[in-house]
Curated annotation (Swiss-Prot):
<dbReference type="GO" id="GO:0005634">
    <property type="term" value="C:nucleus"/>
</dbReference>
<keyword id="KW-0328">Glycosyltransferase</keyword>
<comment type="subunit">
    <text>Homotrimer.</text>
</comment>
<dbReference type="InterPro" id="IPR035994">
    <property type="entry name" value="Nucleoside_phosphorylase_sf"/>
</dbReference>
<feature type="site" description="Important for substrate specificity">
    <location>
        <position position="222"/>
    </location>
</feature>
<dbReference type="GO" id="GO:0005829">
    <property type="term" value="C:cytosol"/>
</dbReference>
<feature type="binding site">
    <location>
        <begin position="57"/>
        <end position="58"/>
    </location>
    <ligand>
        <name>phosphate</name>
    </ligand>
</feature>
<dbReference type="InterPro" id="IPR010044">
    <property type="entry name" value="MTAP"/>
</dbReference>
<feature type="binding site">
    <location>
        <position position="185"/>
    </location>
    <ligand>
        <name>substrate</name>
    </ligand>
</feature>
<comment type="pathway">
    <text>Amino-acid biosynthesis; L-methionine biosynthesis via salvage pathway; S-methyl-5-thio-alpha-D-ribose 1-phosphate from S-methyl-5'-thioadenosine (phosphorylase route): step 1/1.</text>
</comment>
<keyword id="KW-0539">Nucleus</keyword>
<keyword id="KW-0963">Cytoplasm</keyword>
<dbReference type="InterPro" id="IPR018099">
    <property type="entry name" value="Purine_phosphorylase-2_CS"/>
</dbReference>
<keyword id="KW-0808">Transferase</keyword>
<dbReference type="GO" id="GO:0006166">
    <property type="term" value="P:purine ribonucleoside salvage"/>
</dbReference>
<comment type="similarity">
    <text>Belongs to the PNP/MTAP phosphorylase family. MTAP subfamily.</text>
</comment>
<feature type="binding site">
    <location>
        <begin position="90"/>
        <end position="91"/>
    </location>
    <ligand>
        <name>phosphate</name>
    </ligand>
</feature>
Length: 290
């Protein structure tokens, strides 16, 4: 691997399979106790010099459905190569009139509607990181052409449902009553696993549609979603050029309180009662279990 470990990892969602406009310097195939990640990890050199890591959540050919994504391997591999922070992109549906297609949301909370078995936690997103990312995005979009069409929203609630699937109209309205603002299929278990690996995590959610709750519209179709995803990809690439420098510098200077050390006393089982095999597996991401 290159001499400088990447502090920041980027997970690309649907349509974002590489970072445009940034020089790729190395491709890594990382083996983890949970298998290989969904794509090779590509290291990109930012114009200012630092290296960042990128992987495609669904694979470079979008071969993994939301329920098939090897999230444990993805998170473990990014942790292994030195990442302390993850910026994840995802295509999402809007559950609110004021959050329009092509808008950007940096959520602060999640409601879990998946079938995963991980325990919930109080703050699924790093609050300092989401604040920095939101500020950086707002500054970036002011320079975009037709920037008035791209709203930026923070302090919103993401619903994560089991996928691949789209909501019925009744389900969509139920999620609105729950207090959800956006809906997707990928933020979990990703956010939970990032916390377990002591990685700060923030989601940049790009709106593709209004889900199915609007009575005045036909239910969302795959064609509709894919058309908006294509329009969002160029925005994603322009945002990465702006925000990755800021996030890297904040981590390098110690301005973000990362999650390092938060899991050391979070396992209730006495260390001597944990099997050697489990310790070996855990030590891949948490060295104090070795």
């Amino acid at each position: 691997m290159t001499g400088h470990a990447p502090l920041v990892g980027v997970i690309g969602g649907s349509g974002l399979y590489k970072l445009e406009g940034i020089e790729p310097v190395e491709s890594l195939n990382i083996d983890t106790p949970w298998g290989r990640p969904s794509s090779p990890i590509t290291l990109f050199k930012l114009p200012s010099g630092p290296v960042v890591a990128f992987l495609a959540r669904h694979g470079v050919s979008h071969q993994f459905t939301p329920s098939e994504v090897p999230s444990r391997a993805n998170i473990a591999a990014l942790k292994k190569i030195g990442c302390q922070v993850i910026i994840a992109f995802s295509a999402v549906g809007s559950l609110r009139e004021e959050i329009k297609p092509r808008d950007i949301v940096v959520p602060s909370q999640i409601i879990d509607r998946t079938k995963s078995a991980h325990a919930m936690f109080g703050e699924p997103f790093d609050t300092e990181l989401t604040g920095l990312v939101t500020k950086s995005i707002k500054e970036a979009v002011t320079g975009f052409e037709m920037n008035d069409r791209i709203g930026v929203h923070a302090e919103k609630v993401a619903i994560c449902m089991e996928g691949p699937a789209f909501s019925t109209r009744a389900e969509s309205n139920m999620y609105r009553m729950f207090g959800g603002d956006i809906i997707n299929m990928s933020v979990l278990p990703e956010a939970k696993l990032a916390r377990e690996a002591e990685l700060s995590y923030a989601l940049i959610a790009q709106i593709t549609d209004y889900d199915a709750w609007r009575e005045s519209e036909e239910p969302v179709t795959v064609a509709e979603v894919m058309a908006t995803i294509a329009a969002n990809v160029s925005v994603s690439n322009r945002l990465t050029l702006t925000i990755l420098d800021e996030v890297h510098n904040a981590v390098a200077k110690g301005q973000l309180k990362t999650c390092k050390g938060t899991m050391e006393y979070s396992v209730m089982t006495k260390k001597e009662m944990i099997s050697e095999e489990s310790k070996k597996t855990l030590s891949f991401i948490l060295p104090y279990f070795s």
